[in-house]
Amino acid sequence: MGLNFTKMHGLGNDYIVINEFDGEKIKEDEKAEFSKKICKRGFSIGADGVIFVQPATDEKYDIRFRIFNSDGSEAEMCGNGIRCFSKFVYERVMQKNPLNVETMGGLRVSEMNIENNIVKSIKVFMGAPTFELKDIPMVVEGKSENDVFLDEEIELKNALLNSVKLSVVNVGNPHAVIFMKDNNLKAPFIRTHLNILGKEIEHHSVFPEKINVHFVEIVNPQEIKIITWERGAGYTTACGTGTTSSVIIANKLGKTGNKVLAHLDGGDLEIEIKEDGVYMEGDAVIVYDGELYQY
């Protein structure tokens, strides 16, 4: 008998969902290597990451969300992933709405728009952002761990750019946001050289635990476009926490309002900044169920 799984995606960001709510399917010390192996496109199922549905470890949560990237690293949070997770949980595990989700990045609350017991869209309370360098983490000469890094430059070592101006924020996981116009960059240039630029910034020495990278174009105060390079996954069609971070930084620097429509390669997300925190809204899709025999 094989291992049951569900393939899902959120704006083209695709995941393999493993239901461990009623018991462990993959041993804890094997989850990283398992995820790395089955995410390899062309050789196994192929995905940007693996989501494990688990019982909560504390009664204040309804259920636990865990996600491993395609390189085997475990991430604290994932915006597109948690929307997929929430749809899966409501339709396959427990019909609870809203859903209090335990993540490594803290509590996330999913509120689902439901029609005929099918989840059509999910609004997730993403919590409040943190900007201090200790929360990224980021190590910068001349700055303390309580300082922030907003609209400042870091040096690069590639032949394309000597430096780049960026801002950093943590929304459960860390993100670097780069506004293309402020760096005299155009989207075609970024797309052509994303493997070089995204990878170098992700692995830059100032980020000891690496970082997610987003190149942002401001369309108008209510609309942005984003090109994403995810930590541990590389280019992806969308990133929910990255979109949230991009809007937070854009708003903080006076470039956008509190409610923004973000266009990503995989589709659109709506982000709203309120007094109690930030909300992300978008859909999620169950593509197919399957059974894995070699892993």
Swiss-Prot record:
It catalyses: (2S,6S)-2,6-diaminopimelate = meso-2,6-diaminopimelate. Substrate binds at residues 13, 69, 79-80, 173, 212, 230-231, 240-241. Pathway: Amino-acid biosynthesis; L-lysine biosynthesis via DAP pathway; DL-2,6-diaminopimelate from LL-2,6-diaminopimelate: step 1/1. It is found in: Cytoplasm. The active site is at 78 (proton donor), 239 (proton acceptor). It is an enzyme of class 5 (isomerase). One of its GO terms (biological process) is lysine biosynthetic process via diaminopimelate. GO terms for molecular function: diaminopimelate epimerase activity. The record marks 175, 230 as: Could be important to modulate the pK values of the two catalytic cysteine residues. Its EC number is 5.1.1.7. PROSITE patterns: DAP_EPIMERASE (PS01326). GO terms for cellular component: cytosol. Catalyzes the stereoinversion of LL-2,6-diaminopimelate (L,L-DAP) to meso-diaminopimelate (meso-DAP), a precursor of L-lysine. PANTHER family: DIAMINOPIMELATE EPIMERASE (PTHR31689:SF0), DIAMINOPIMELATE EPIMERASE, CHLOROPLASTIC (PTHR31689). Homodimer. Belongs to the diaminopimelate epimerase family. This is Diaminopimelate epimerase. The lineage of its organism: Archaea, Methanobacteriati, Methanobacteriota, Methanomada group, Methanococci. The gene is dapF.
